[in-house]
């Protein structure tokens, strides 16, 4: 789809000059150089994002939760009933799920988006971008057509860009869908080249005696569908799911506006791998929130070259980790904008060679 290709080509590069200025500013703050560690690096990374105009700051915050069912659930790869997807989506509209509580704590809005829930009628209160009532069973067929994947990507990109126009400067991604760690593992295995046995985990408490079947399902899905690891859209369409496509769309949409997007857990790592295959230029806009407890998490993150800020043994999904980490983004912005400067206090520290702290 040419429209998608054209959009991917417009993703702005990180502003290295702005990052250099930010580095000098951070080095001149009222502290020993480097003493705030990763917060300093994060502030500098944010300064380089064109959508923030060289000054790390947070406006409105939004967590976009992509909700979808998966045909591969029929293969016995999850213990939760498929109906839980719809039930939990309804609970999100009431603000009672984990991501809703954590997002409220962070002052972020949660956008609950139906991209493929298997119900006869749309669920009231959800944003309706439903492509179909669940994806195909990847163990016996592709998850969706390439056209479906491309259209959903574009729809989500446009929605994300509209939020940016309305003042959102920090995005988080989340998902909801029974059995969705199976297609996520298939994506990670395909793109990293690692064997399914290395990346398939227990998801939402799958009994260990059922893990061998889940590994076999992922292996069969890859063998049958033959996704091209160099083509992110192909991977998503053949062994992914509508929720994974939606997450990738948020990443692409935020990056196209020069704005940061917080990853969540394993599902978001998989979507990020596919999105980076579509456009490597988005990678500097991706901020990893936490280390998922899912088995293939470190493999996916290593391939992305990302190191999470939190390690909380979390594997809920929903965007819970992204919501939790929003305070870290705000902290990085706060130190950049609100700390005093060494020069103003006539402090000269050994090793600080900054000549013009305000340049």
Curated annotation (Swiss-Prot):
Enzyme category, top tier: transferase
One BP term from GO: cobalamin biosynthetic process
UniProt KW Ribonucleoprotein keyword: no
Entry-linked CDD domains: DMB-PRT_CobT (cd02439)
Intrachain disulfide bonds: none
Catalytic residue positions: 318
UniProt name for this protein: Nicotinate-nucleotide--dimethylbenzimidazole phosphoribosyltransferase
UniProt source species: Escherichia coli O6:H1 (strain CFT073 / ATCC 700928 / UPEC)
